[in-house]
Amino acid sequence: MKNRFLILLSFVLIVGRDVVCANTSMVRERININRDWRYQIDDPDGVGAALHYSRLKPYLLPCANDFIIFGKRYQRPEGNPGENIAYVKSDFDDSEWRHLNLPHDWAIEGPFNIDYNGSTGKLPYWGIRWYRKTLELSQDDAGKQIYLDIDGAMSYVSVWCNGQYVGGWPYGYASFRLDLTPYIKAGQKNVLAIRLDNPDDTSRWYPGSGIYRNVWLVKTSPVHVEQWGTFVRNQQVDSEIAVMEMGVNIENHAGKDVQVKLQTSVRPVGEEVTQSNTKDIAIKKDSWSSARFQFKVDKPKLWDIDTPNCYVAVSRVFMDGKEMDSYETPFGIRTIEFTHNQGFMLNGQKVAIKGVCMHHDLGALGAAFNEVAAERQLRIMKEMG
């Protein structure tokens, strides 16, 4: 059982990671930018309330528009908050700041103080911190969409690029994406400045601090598969055949209406393509379109907790015969149901679900994500049943 679990764990931590990083083509890159950041404690003198959340909130809310399907969408106000603050400017000399790599949790560094309030580890998780990094883009990146993906930062994050306020995210337990395209310059050095403001007395447990998970720079063509823009779900599964439905959302930032061809192929991980599907899609300017289709898998290899068989769907977008994007969606084929007398059933077999109360931090290592430590946590939970 333990050996089988190690196989599953290896797939999640190694193959799964490679699948994410392999969402690339000639026009899509997902680059880890964890290395070589500069770090500073507190705001410079004179900032006062200029960067208080109450003032930045109207600029942060539009960053959530992609998640709002129905209801109000927020409009960003005019202006450039913080433009006169030294730390956001491209020519600011940060050479005296501390040099570090992400992920980073400043609170775990201490000092420990038994008199701190609450059950938060008695560690100084609150306060204001700044991170800065220089990025150099090639001239080949001109005309591309450039995104910043932050997997986790605690909390009330604000981001500037080349002195311009891009946006941010208030909530510390969610990943988020910002569009750097209007602010970044191809063929030049670009400076990111990121400010975190972690309030005191806002948590009943140890929340961690800092940019505590990975940070990515994503480059795509103007016409590309939307972030998290695919799904695969079962319609029929038995030992002989699996009938699956897939959806793919494609965004158009090309400045005009476009006609694209979407080609999606399906294969078991590490094996040859078993089938493919092609659709023609019209997408309005500054909009998106969705394609849905069925595919069948003969004699499917089912996913379960001991034999985590997986497949991958590769969606390629073509316009005028040129490949614009390639996006991989890993998935497993399985059936799940709840019954009144057996409880949870996976592929027709009873599986006991046991829960634990586990926060996102890694004990004495703090909240900064560590792959080996997370693997250890999974091993322990698996051994618990």
Task: Give the ranges of each region predicted by the language model.
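Bacterial Sec-dependent N-terminal signal peptides
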Residues: 1-25
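Short beta-strand edge segments in extracellular beta-sheet folds
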Residues: 218, 282, 330-334
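Extracellular recognition modules
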Residues: 193-195, 312-316
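Signal that preferentially marks extracellular ectodomain short beta-strand elements
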Residues: 178-183, 293-308
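Accessory carbohydrate-binding/adhesion or oligomerization-edge regions at the termini
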Residues: 20-114, 191-197
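Accessory beta-strand-rich segments of carbohydrate-active enzymes
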Residues: 31, 42-44, 76, 83, ...
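N-terminal carbohydrate-binding accessory modules
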Residues: 28, 229-230, 314-383
